[in-house]
Amino acid sequence: TIAYGLRNLTDFEGGLREMYRVAKPGGRMLVLDFGKPSFGPWRWFYFTYLKWMVPMFGRIFCSDAPAYAYIHESLEHYPAQDGVAKVMRDIECREVTIHRILGSAMTINVGVK
């Protein structure tokens, strides 16, 4: 299980392969992270919010806007839910599913070894 961390790895596919390697047969792999909504208006609002509002809140409440700006930046190169599901299938996970939360703003990818 990994939460809000896979997109921060330099080799997210390698991270998934390692999770698969250490999982017991029949064990579940879960990946919780930010997603990429497919519905156009929601996607626009979501990414606008992440790019502008989240860093502003980070500056106001935590005095650290760059730490929160990083969320949007890290999503630009992250394949999100569909890319994670594809890699899970490629490494032979079974029963791969995507649970979409808040219109795919957050997602949980699940696979079984």
Q: Each predicted region: which residue ranges?
A:
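C-terminal lobe and adjacent flexible extensions of AdoMet/dcAdoMet transferase-like proteins
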Residues: V87-K113
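C-terminal alpha-helical "lid/dimerization" subdomain adjacent to the S-adenosyl-L-methionine
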Residues: L32-I91, T97
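A short glycine-rich, Lys/Arg-flanked "PGG" loop and its adjoining helix->strand segment in the class I
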Residues: E13-R28
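Short glycine-/acidic-enriched loop or helix-start segments at secondary-structure transitions
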Residues: F12, G40-P41, I108
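Residue-level signal for the nucleotide or nucleotide-sugar donor/cofactor binding architecture
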Residues: R7-D11, E76-P79, M106
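A short SAM/SAH-binding and catalytic strip from SAM-dependent methyltransferases
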Residues: T1-F12, G35
